[in-house]
């Protein structure tokens, strides 16, 4: 039964990822006053399927000097970790109800760094290695603020479980009392998923393609899938943390529709940002985090810790 549930979670996610690539190309196309893909199928709707067929039927080329095992393990690990992070997400019921689901997701996203590092190191290419080192530094740095923001949200909800956040936000979204946190969280998720304007790992002008420069065909497709799975997952997590919907146990499908709509809108915002903003310089990226976000998130975390203690002294208003 668990395997059936797992497949019923993973299959729609992979399908959503496939069509997210099409949505991205269409949105970027219309923003640049062109049509985007229109050849394969009606309105280009079958483009993701043809892309998948093309990538997986190509010969998986491998550099002679690369470390074979690690070279092939890295993309597999990247996708496996990206899909594992969907397990504790309540939609409205999670696949397994963990008490420490937020910690689990944080741990999984930290492990994703290894896949990137292995791919850059095993490729035995300078471009790939520089791209991987950048990605690792960026991901580890932004995880610091993500963890502190999560801690602040946990202080507001009072539990490490994601399901509790649905009850916490029954009457009011957490984005309203903690909007600075939500803004910093959204920008940090952009950096965490290596999206524009933080896509320094894939700086085409300087690194050709970043850590996946030596990959082609199937392994490249796995990296691609992992990246877009992480994007949707991060937006789903943002929805649960800050835009939680009321879940009526009699009509759970209403929650699911609400949840997916918000996730879709946030993903559209990701694509819109990509079309609008130029890439940051590397020192600006690090400066933004260590000099701006970190002090702010720490101060806000202390504030949310102190707030219940301060208000506990106020006599009840009758």
UniProtKB/Swiss-Prot annotation:
Keyword NADP recorded: no
Recorded hits in HAMAP family, A to Z, give: NDH1_NuoH
Report the EC code(s) recorded for this entry.
Answer: 7.1.1.2
Q: How does it sit in the membrane?
A: Multi-pass membrane protein
Note the PROSITE patterns from the entry. COMPLEX1_ND1_1, COMPLEX1_ND1_2
**Main location per UniProt?**
mitochondrion
Which reactions appear under catalytic activity for this entry? a ubiquinone + NADH + 5 H(+)(in) = a ubiquinol + NAD(+) + 4 H(+)(out)
**Which GO BP terms sit in this record?**
aerobic respiration
Key words of the record: Electron transport, Membrane, Mitochondrion, Mitochondrion inner membrane, NAD, Respiratory chain, Translocase, Transmembrane, Transmembrane helix, Transport, Ubiquinone
**Which cellular components does GO assign to this protein?**
mitochondrial inner membrane
List all membrane-crossing ranges.
2-22, 70-90, 102-122, 147-167, 171-191, 222-242, 253-273, 294-314
- Going by the record, the broad EC class of this enzyme is translocase
Keyword Transport appears in the UniProt entry:
yes
Subcellular location(s) of the protein: Mitochondrion inner membrane
Q: Which GO terms describe its molecular function?
A: NADH dehydrogenase (ubiquinone) activity
Question: By its UniProt entry, which InterPro entries does this protein fall under?
Answer: NADH_UbQ_OxRdtase_su1/FPO, NADH_UbQ_OxRdtase_su1_CS
- What function does this protein fulfil? Core subunit of the mitochondrial membrane respiratory chain NADH dehydrogenase (Complex I) that is believed to belong to the minimal assembly required for catalysis. Complex I functions in the transfer of electrons from NADH to the respiratory chain. The immediate electron acceptor for the enzyme is believed to be ubiquinone.
Give the gene name: MT-ND1
According to UniProt, the name of this protein is NADH-ubiquinone oxidoreductase chain 1
| UniProt lineage | Eukaryota, Metazoa, Chordata, Craniata, Vertebrata
Instruction: From the UniProt record, list the coiled-coil ranges.
Output: none
In the record, the note on similarity to other proteins reads: Belongs to the complex I subunit 1 family.
């Amino acid at each position: 039964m668990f395997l059936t549930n797992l497949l019923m979670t993973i299959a729609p996610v992979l399908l959503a990822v496939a069509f997210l690539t099409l949505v991205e190309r269409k949105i970027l196309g219309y923003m640049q006053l062109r049509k985007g893909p229109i050849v394969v199928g009606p309105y280009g709707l079958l483009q993701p399927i043809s892309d998948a067929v093309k990538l997986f039927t190509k010969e998986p080329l491998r550099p002679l000097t690369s470390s074979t095992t690690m070279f092939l393990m890295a993309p597999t690990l990247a996708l496996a970790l990206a899909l594992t992070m969907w397990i504790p997400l309540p939609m409205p019921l999670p696949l397994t109800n963990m008490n420490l689901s937020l910690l689990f997701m944080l741990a999984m996203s930290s492990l994703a760094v290894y896949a990137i590092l292995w791919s850059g190191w095993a490729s035995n290419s300078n471009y790939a290695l520089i791209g991987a080192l950048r990605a690792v530094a960026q991901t580890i740095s932004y995880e610091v603020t993500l963890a502190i923001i999560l801690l602040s949200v946990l202080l507001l909800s009072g539990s490490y479980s994601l399901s509790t956040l649905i009850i916490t936000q029954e009457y009011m979204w957490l984005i309203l009392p903690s909007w600075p946190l939500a803004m910093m969280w959204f920008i940090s998720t952009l950096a965490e998923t290596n999206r524009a304007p933080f896509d320094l790992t894939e700086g085409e002008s300087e690194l050709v393609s970043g850590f996946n420069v030596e990959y082609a065909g199937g392994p490249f497709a796995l990296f691609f899938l992992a990246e877009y799975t992480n994007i949707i997952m991060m937006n789903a997590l943002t929805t649960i943390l800050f835009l939680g919907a009321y879940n009526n146990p009699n009509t759970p499908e209403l929650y699911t529709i609400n949840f997916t709509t918000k996730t879709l809108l946030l993903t559209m915002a990701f694509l819109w940002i990509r079309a609008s903003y130029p890439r940051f310089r590397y020192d600006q990226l690090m400066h933004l985090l260590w000099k701006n976000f970190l002090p702010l998130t720490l101060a806000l975390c202390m504030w949310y810790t102190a707030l219940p203690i301060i208000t506990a002294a106020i006599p009840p208003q009758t």
